[in-house]
Amino acid sequence: MAKTLDKSKKRKLVKSKSTNFDKKQKINKQQQQPESSTPYSSSSSSSDSSDSESDNEFDPEELRELLQPYSKDQLVDLVCSASRIGSSIYSAVVEAADRDVTHRKIFVYGLPWETTRETLVGVFEGYGEIEECTVVIDKATGKAKGFGFVMFKTRKGAKEALKEPKKRILNRTATCQLASMGPAASGKGHDQPGPVKISMGSMANHGQPQQQQVQGQHVFNGGGMAASPFMLGNQYHPLYGAGMLGNPALAAAAAAGGGYMYPMLAGALAHGGLGSDMVQSSQMGGIGVDPSVGAAGLSALGSYFRGQSLPSTYPDSDAGGKRGTGKDSDAGGSSFHGYSNYS
């Protein structure tokens, strides 16, 4: 009995040893499998990470080339959308804007003559720390020219100051704006237009008035409104018709008088001619032509309208120095309806 018990014990011990050995082998196999797989996985992950790092590596030149085709609006939209994704981009944009003088420098105009740098600093220092302040001074008088510049250290200070563009400085109301916007546009008053004058030098542009500004006077080339203090014409007036275009000498004679066409000459042209007695008259300055032109200047009119008479503007008057036909017919010189002349 004792022998059989010993044998059974030996068998149990052998079985337990074998099971323990099998367990150890299984554990070793399980430990060896991840060890064999880890080198492969680590190498693959390291290669992937190196590729991703090489793709995402920041290259300023490449980024500039990528952004070059975009317009300004597209770039602004791109930065705004990127700022929503990452706050770091927004903070970078704000930081760059704070460093830029464009958003921090203010132009102040409408200052009193007594304004000094200390006066301007006292007005704007409540909005933020001031980095620089300048009042432009006239060297001749030593007084302010009426404008100056204030530059804040931060963009926030300039933004706060511009919330109220009108500032009361001493006894005047000044206005401020960003200096990057340029000088303020000067207000244009309702000035009355100067005398209108016609240029007869370019009659080829008939019907196409071209307005020019010459020494404060409005000049119309070609057709347009006549420039006589006694008559206002238009582009359909016979003055600009065949009478002027058909005879260059006529246009030259009219231009010699400064372009002023009085009713007598305009009426003559409107009715198709100018009498020969008018052409040879000694009072050529009275019909809108410079007296210096003389008979030589209007000789072309006589040859062009010879044989045609000038319609009388005042039927009861005689402009040729004859006696009037009114009740006071004995009055000498020119008279109208019997009233003697003032000479």
From Swiss-Prot:
GO cellular component, one term: nucleus
Record keywords, A-Z: Nucleus, RNA-binding
Localization per record: Nucleus
GO molecular function: identical protein binding; RNA binding
Ranges where the RRM domain occurs: 104-181
Sequence ranges of Low complexity compositional bias: 28-49
Pfam families in the record: RRM_1 (PF00076)
InterPro entries associated with the record: Nucleotide-bd_a/b_plait_sf, RBD_domain_sf, RNA-binding_reg, RRM_dom
Name of the protein in question: UBP1-associated proteins 1A
Species whose genome carries this gene: Arabidopsis thaliana (Mouse-ear cress)
Source species taxonomy: Eukaryota, Viridiplantae, Streptophyta, Embryophyta, Tracheophyta
